[in-house]
């Protein structure tokens, strides 16, 4: 794509008014070595169009929410009807009840749900609730799992799994994260060691059941069930962060695939149909501790606003239709199979995997196990950056980070998938 001038000009202007020129760091394309990002003008279906009128097949989908594709006609119509009746009331509305009922119907492990405005708000609230319910302070998270930008989650492992949390962002006091313990994903020994040392102090484990913020790493056989068991043994809560996987890998989320019941679940992305929304829910006994039913405070000016609720209701209605996830999964599988076959044809060190409408790209042989954050760091990250640049220049918009999962929508056509595979095949051949 030769014409990128308007994006370049806009990025230079944006940097004068917005820190780094973007409102979320990954959007700057800095992690993939690009000088500037593409500024998007509009989107429709499986495509993004930038301010220079370049067209891209979109495999980000606004980082997951756009499971129906951009500007789905039914979702737009529902939103437009609601807009005429008001944007936000600051009072309860029927749409909140309807969306809550739909979520509980599709995720039976959730008995009650509270709406917030983002995934970060959802995880913050779930952790606060878990601490209050257990009367304990320490939490366990996993290296490489992202749960939003709250202070208590911005923690690196330090020198070993037993280290107390050390902040990895300036502005996060050590006292804030001293109760955040970090374990290694898929490593039960690291979890057991933490429980042995802090047995009666651990309020909860929070985990992405499929780690979508270190590309796409699946839990090894029995890992999630073992987390459930060790939480039960120690009267700690298990929180599944399904902001990314909820209604994306399956209609009932990852918990329905692995048949493991969390105490609390956090949601976002798909449940808002592209509008800002998050939620946390779980056992009624626990959720009844949330204000005003109980003492655990949580509030939000725009929480449960009718626009986001309406978009979520229509989105969940559509993805609940028989055969939806079969079709979505088939699209992702076709993409992944084609990429793997292309890499194999040229003996290129690459493999891809998928589940539902989510996929991961790994620049290493399929004979190399990638089960942890450390494993992912050993893959060819430089080659991913080259692949990203090549695909972007040829009209395929991938996540601008080797640590992020990709997303496919029901709007992607066979032609879109075939074009993507053909471009990748050419890259594998030339590199």
Curated annotation (Swiss-Prot):
TM ranges: none
Major location category of this protein: cytoplasm
Pathway(s) annotated for this protein in UniProt: Porphyrin-containing compound metabolism; protoporphyrin-IX biosynthesis; 5-aminolevulinate from L-glutamyl-tRNA(Glu): step 2/2
Cofactor(s) needed for function: pyridoxal 5'-phosphate
Record InterPro entries: 4pyrrol_synth_GluAld_NH2Trfase, Aminotrans_3, Aminotrans_3_PPA_site, PyrdxlP-dep_Trfase, PyrdxlP-dep_Trfase_major, PyrdxlP-dep_Trfase_small
Pfam families (alphabetical): Aminotran_3 (PF00202)
GO molecular function: glutamate-1-semialdehyde 2,1-aminomutase activity; pyridoxal phosphate binding; transaminase activity
Compartments where found: Cytoplasm
Sequence positions bearing N6-(pyridoxal phosphate)lysine: 269
Keywords for the protein's UniProt record, in alphabetical order: Cytoplasm, Isomerase, Porphyrin biosynthesis, Pyridoxal phosphate
Keyword Nucleotidyltransferase in record: no
EC id: 5.4.3.8
GO biological process assignments: protoporphyrinogen IX biosynthetic process
GO cellular component, one term: cytoplasm
Annotated family: Belongs to the class-III pyridoxal-phosphate-dependent aminotransferase family. HemL subfamily.
Name of the protein in its database record: Glutamate-1-semialdehyde 2,1-aminomutase
């Amino acid at each position: 794509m030769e014409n990128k001038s308007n994006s370049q000009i806009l990025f230079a202007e944006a940097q004068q008014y917005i820190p780094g020129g973007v409102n979320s760091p990954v959007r700057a394309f800095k992690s993939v070595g690009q000088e500037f990002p593409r500024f998007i003008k509009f989107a429709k279906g499986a495509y993004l169009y930038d301010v220079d009128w370049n067209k891209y097949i979109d495999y980000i989908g606004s980082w997951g929410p756009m499971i129906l594709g951009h500007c789905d006609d039914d979702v737009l119509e529902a939103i437009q009807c609601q807009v005429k009746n008001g944007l936000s009331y600051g009072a309860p509305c029927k749409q909140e009840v309807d969306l809550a009922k739909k979520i509980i119907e599709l995720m039976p492990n959730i008995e009650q749900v509270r709406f917030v405005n983002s995934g970060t708000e959802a995880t913050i609230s779930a952790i606060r609730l878990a601490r209050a319910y257990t009367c304990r302070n320490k939490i366990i998270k996993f290296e490489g799992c992202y749960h939003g930008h709250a202070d208590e989650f911005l923690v690196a492992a330090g020198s070993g799994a037993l280290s107390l949390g050390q902040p990895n962002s300036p502005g996060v006091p050590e006292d804030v994260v001293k109760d955040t313990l970090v374990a290694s994903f898929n490593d039960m020994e690291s979890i057991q060691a933490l429980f042995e040392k802090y047995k009666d102090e651990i309020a909860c484990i929070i985990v992405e059941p499929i780690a979508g913020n270190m590309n796409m790493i699946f839990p090894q056989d029995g890992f999630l069930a073992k987390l459930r068991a060790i939480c039960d043994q120690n009267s700690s809560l298990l929180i599944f962060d399904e902001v990314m996987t909820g209604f994306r890998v399956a209609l009932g989320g990852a918990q329905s695939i692995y048949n493991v019941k969390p105490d609390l679940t956090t949601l976002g992305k798909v449940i808002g149909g592209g509008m800002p929304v998050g939620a946390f829910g779980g056992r009624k006994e626990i959720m009844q501790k949330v204000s005003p039913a109980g003492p655990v405070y949580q509030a939000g000016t725009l929480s449960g606003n009718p626009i986001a609720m309406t978009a979520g209701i229509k989105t969940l209605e559509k993805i609940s239709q028989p055969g939806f996830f079969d079709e979505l999964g088939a699209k992702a599988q076709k993409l992944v199979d084609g990429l793997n076959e292309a890499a194999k044809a040229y003996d290129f060190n690459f493999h891809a995997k998928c589940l539902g409408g989510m996929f991961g790209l790994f620049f290493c042989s399929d004979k190399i196990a990638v089960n942890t954050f450390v494993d992912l760091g050993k893959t060819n990250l430089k080659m991913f950056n080259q692949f990203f640049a090549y695909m972007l220049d040829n009209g395929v918009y991938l996540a601008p980070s080797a640590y992020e999962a990709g997303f496919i929508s029901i709007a992607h056509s066979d032609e879109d998938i075939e074009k993507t595979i053909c471009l990748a095949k050419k890259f594998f051949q030339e590199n």
